[in-house]
Design a protein with these regions (language model features):
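N-terminal low-complexity, intrinsically disordered patches enriched in charged
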Residues: 18-20, 48, 283
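Outer-membrane beta-barrel pore domains
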Residues: 26, 30, 52-53, 64-65, ...
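Outer membrane beta-barrel
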Residues: 25-54, 60-217, 293, 301-322, ...
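Gram-negative bacterial Sec-dependent N-terminal signal peptides
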Residues: 1-23
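Short hydrophobic/aromatic segments of transmembrane alpha-helices and their interfaces
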Residues: 5-6, 72, 151-152, 357-358, ...
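Domain-scale selection of a single, long terminal region
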Residues: 2-9, 186-193, 199-218, 252-271, ...
């Protein structure tokens, strides 16, 4: 679904004149369950300072308009939630833009303790990043980090058990495929543990670790990363799609394991967080195993003075102190991912192992949360990408810069 500039302008005007609303809409009490309705709508615009690739193409090789830009609806999430009867909670979410199910699960809280529960259905796995486990509407930057998008395991159907308290927690899950048809497959399990030795208002220190192990889908996996712009079709960093070549992971790959480490520090209006992930792919028929990794470090400053909260091992974003003026944030992130595990064979057009490429990026961002339901984001992203070409027998580079804007309405 494409949005014209006129449509985006109308959406902005509607956001400016709409009255403030609550964070969720209470619907009814059905079967002793308090049912509420939530939603999230995001519209994105990208303008590319291209290097070698036209990222303005909706489909690679089909864009001939000469415009290095994209504008489109990013998310249109509709979510029903229920509390009760008793200690039961449930959720059913769907993204009408991406045509996929979101969280769709039932949770039972032991002793009505939010930190001690069992959950069945589709949910974000403990093998995801802390960034992924946080609410999407409060992400610090328009694009999530490369390890979140490329290495972590997000939503899958399964069961998990969580035990903890306000400042620590342990989670274990077993999962299968994603609920939506033709999405992620491969059964596995995930673990996450976290501890916050300091957990006070405006003063938080958090450490965490995660592990996941899963089967591949039909003995293949494809790891790739977009240039910090979620809607582009072309991905320069890519371990390949061939189902016959030994130099891609899309064949003869048996199991995948990912280890993650995370840290968070909040002091008043300042937040510093970072995450690291390393991935190992066990290969078949004598092929060498593959290893890759990545990390990000980000800092955020609430210019208007608000601070963050803490829940379930993730930071929570506050409402503006002054709804009419809103909450202003300034952020900076460094991000890197390395999908190279091999080397060229000198004098030939062949390689040992898999050379998917390496990407580094810097993102500078400004966010404005207005009242209770609106958010506007501006990002400037500088990307450096490098990958070995067997055709050229040399490394290729693609180093675009991207201006990104997002308008968001949520309730």
């Amino acid at each position: 679904m494409k949005l014209s500039r006129n449509t985006l302008a109308v959406a902005l005007l509607a956001a400016l004149v709409a009255p403030a609303a609550h964070a969720e809409v209470a619907l009814d009490v059905i079967g002793n369950s308090e049912v509420s309705f939530e939603g999230l709508v995001q519209a994105d615009f990208y303008k590319f300072d291209t290097d070698t690739i036209d990222y303005g193409a909706d489909v690679p090789g089909t864009d001939v308009d000469g415009k290095d830009s994209l504008n489109e609806l990013r998310r249109a999430e509709l979510v029903l939630k229920g509390k009760g009867p008793g200690n039961i909670e449930w959720v059913l979410g769907y993204d009408a833009k991406d045509d996929k199910f979101l969280d769709a699960n039932v949770k039972y809280k032991f002793g009505n303790n939010a930190n001690h529960f069992i959950q069945v259905g589709q949910f974000k796995q403990p093998g995801a990043t802390m960034e992924e486990l946080s609410s999407t509407k409060n992400n610090d930057f328009i694009s999530k980090s490369s390890i979140t998008n490329s290495l972590g395991t997000a939503r899958r159907v399964g069961a998990q058990y969580n035990y903890g308290d306000n400042n620590w927690g342990l989670t274990a899950s077993y999962f299968g495929r994603e609920l939506t048809r033709n999405r992620e497959h491969g059964a596995g399990y995930g673990l996450r543990g976290y501890y916050a030795p300091i957990n006070e208002a405006g003063n938080i220190l958090h450490f965490g670790a995660s592990y996941s192990d899963k089967d591949t889908d039909a003995d293949g996996i494809r790891l790739r990363a977009r240039p910090m712009a979620d809607m582009v079709a072309t991905r320069f960093i890519d371990t390949g799609s061939s189902v016959t070549s030994a130099n891609t992971l899309n064949n003869r790959s048996d199991r995948v394991s990912v280890i993650g480490a995370e840290g968070l520090w909040v002091k008043g209006p300042f937040k510093l967080q970072g995450e690291y992930m390393t991935i190992d792919v066990k290969r078949l028929n004598g092929l060498s195993d593959f290893s890759g990794d990545g990390f990000y470090v980000s800092g955020l400053w609430n210019i208007s003075g608000e601070t963050w909260g803490y829940k379930a091992g993730t930071p929570t974003t506050p409402l503006p102190n002054d709804p009419a003026k809103g909450m202003w944030q300034l952020g900076l992130r460094y991000d890197t991912i390395d999908l190279n595990d091999g080397s060229p064979i000198v004098g030939t057009n062949r390689v040992n192992g898999v050379l998917g490429g390496k990407m580094d990026s810097w993102t500078l961002g400004v966010n404005w949360y207005w009242r209770s339901n609106f958010k506007f984001m501006l990002n400037y992203v500088m990307v450096d990408q490098e990958k070995y070409s067997t055709t050229l027998r040399a490394k290729q580079e693609d180093n675009p810069n991207v201006f990104e804007a997002r308008m968001q309405f949520y309730w």
